[in-house]
């Protein structure tokens, strides 16, 4: 991994720098002393007690290194684990670099003491002493790079990358037949819980960058898995109650039949994060809905209907939660992502019609909760889907249009002007697309409205020339704005409305 490579590079450069400096220092001293021979450079055979004196500070140096490492790790790891995930401690201890460094320092410290004990009046274990000296130097050379490695290890971005790498590796090993599917499932369940915990805690602390990285990482996991799913063994798709605690027997049966436990597990983390984001981090909401939409679109493109169905079910859960919380901003974003998904369904009339039905259903649910503005905005998005279906000559175009015009434009406190305008925009767009038969259906739907009200709506739509809305929004485009060629069709549609 990148952190490990940085550690190795730092260690090599530090070792090289120390070697060059110490060698140059020795060469200068040796030259200044008149090039003394080997017998004058060593205490061996002359005064072995000096060798013990030499190794005593080395033992203390090792103790200092170990003390610094243990103090740093003992403080930093638990504190960071408390912020992100308790499993961080286990991750740290399982990391190969940490195991090697801590083990090498402990063995090196013990070896210095062992070498010092071996020294006797007539015996000098020179290879053991040399190993102790060079081991001490290498330990100090590794100290600073390893400190940086530990700090990077605790970076939540790196933690998320490690978790994602573990999941991808487990999938790859199962695909190649080198890991039992049940064992891989256990690994993945644990890694998913850890990732979800980091994302949720980041949202709670308003740590937006980490939350967004976690969401993005989950999306990448699903993308990678989607490319491998067809190659996974049959045993991979079998799960039991232990894997989904709380699920009914019927639910488990559906999961096994649809072979979508992995998507369900990952996207459950999306949903839990979404629930937290509704109250604390509004900028995480578009990231979650966009990731879900991308997952659904990719599933459609590779012909994985089961994965598509799971993604859309979670979309509906998001909509339900937003309606319950009466969060218009979240609904505004979800409706946009939902309509964008329709672009990948134009050659799938049944799925496109189902999307239109759900659009209408949740728009009406929003109205029932008093969110009439959300329902009217849904009219624009559902109308956009109807126009795209008509342009693609989709067999479902009339069905999607019927869902759009079925939205009630007559409210308890009077006509809903925004929805009326949305229907007029759709009617004009259908004329532009040479679908006068469908435009007539829209006109018939608006026939219960007074002519002066319809004329006012047409006039206001004609007057909109600025494409961008006058406030900063996620979409930025004014929903009432119409392209010139589209606006030119307002007059013919007004004729269908009987406005002359």
Language-model features: locations:
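Alpha-helical transmembrane segments
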Residues: 10-15, 62-65, 100-104, 130-137
């Amino acid at each position: 991994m990148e952190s490990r490579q940085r550690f190795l590079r730092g260690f090599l450069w530090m070792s090289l720098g120390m070697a060059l400096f110490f060698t140059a220092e020795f060469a200068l001293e040796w030259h200044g002393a008149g090039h003394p021979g080997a017998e004058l450079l060593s205490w061996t055979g002359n005064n072995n007690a000096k060798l013990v004196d030499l190794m005593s500070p080395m033992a203390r140096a090792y103790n200092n290194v170990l003390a610094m490492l243990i103090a740093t790790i003992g403080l930093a790891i638990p504190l960071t684990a408390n912020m992100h995930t308790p499993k961080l401690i286990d991750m740290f201890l399982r990391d190969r670099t940490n195991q090697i460094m801590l083990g090498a320092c402990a063995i090196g410290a013990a070896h210095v003491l062992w070498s010092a004990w071996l020294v006797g009046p007539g015996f000098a274990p020179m290879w053991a002493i040399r190993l102790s000296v060079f081991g001490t130097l290498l330990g100090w050379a590794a100290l600073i790079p390893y400190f940086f490695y530990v700090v990077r290890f605790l970076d939540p971005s790196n933690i998320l990358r490690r978790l994602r790498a573990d999941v991808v590796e487990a999938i790859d090993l199962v695909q190649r037949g080198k890991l039992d599917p049940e064992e891989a499932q256990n690994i993945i369940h644990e890694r998913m819980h850890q990732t979800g915990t980091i994302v949720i805690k980041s949202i709670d602390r308003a740590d937006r960058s980490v939350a967004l990285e976690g969401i993005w990482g989950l999306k990448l996991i699903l993308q990678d898995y989607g490319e491998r799913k067809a190659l996974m063994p049959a045993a991979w798709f079998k799960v039991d109650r232990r894997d989904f605690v709380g699920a009914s027997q019927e639910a488990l049966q559906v999961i096994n039949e649809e072979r979508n436990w992995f998507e369900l597990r990952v996207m459950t983390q999306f949903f839990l994060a979404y629930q937290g984001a509704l109250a604390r981090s509004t900028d995480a909401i578009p990231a979650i809905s966009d990731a879900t939409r991308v997952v659904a679109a990719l599933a459609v493109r590779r012909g994985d209907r089961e994965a598509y169905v799971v993604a859309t079910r979670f979309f509906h859960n998001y909509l339900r939660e937003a309606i319950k919380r009466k969060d218009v901003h979240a609904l505004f974003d979800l409706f946009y992502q939902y309509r964008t998904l329709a672009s990948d369904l134009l050659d799938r009339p049944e799925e496109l019609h189902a999307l239109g039905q759900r659009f209408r259903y949740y728009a009406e649910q929003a109205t029932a909760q008093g969110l009439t503005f959300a329902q009217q905005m849904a009219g624009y998005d559902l109308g956009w889907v109807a126009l795209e279906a008509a342009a693609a000559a989709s067999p479902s175009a009339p069905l999607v249009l019927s869902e759009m015009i079925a939205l009630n434009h007559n409210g308890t406190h009077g006509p809903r002007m925004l929805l009326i305008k949305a229907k007029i925009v759709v009617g004009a767009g259908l004329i532009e697309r040479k679908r006068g038969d469908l435009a007539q259906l829209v006109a018939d739907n608006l026939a219960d409205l007074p002519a002066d009200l319809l004329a006012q709506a047409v006039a206001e739509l004609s007057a909109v020339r600025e494409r961008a809305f006058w406030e900063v929004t996620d979409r930025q485009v004014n929903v009432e704005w119409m392209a010139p060629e589209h606006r030119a069709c307002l007059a013919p549609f007004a004729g269908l409305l009987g406005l002359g």
